């Protein structure tokens, strides 16, 4: 786990709310964003992100945005939001393993930050910038136990 300074990164994504039981609908948003970008000849980063604003559960809804970072800011529309990950210090780590086990890595990162005296950027229950970036292409590595996912939380 580490702290690293990052510059602003433009994004294009679709924001939704869903419980874990509805997560298939969330996962379906990635291909939709890719189609939207391709129709505009915009090259996305190879790794999709999931930006979490509110963490939910099987019964309570997550507020999540699924998308891709892009080289320069793009105009959004009614469906795809143009945004950015803000400039700042981020607490970062990499989860290696099945996505179903990623909550443990999130908890470890939050505990580590607290132990270092680092306050993560939140406004009540809403995270300012907390996201997962999926580093492994499932078409290349089909075993989810080998997948790598970067977790990043903006420092307050």
Task: Report the location of each language-model feature.
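A solvent-exposed interaction/effector surface
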Residues: 1-156
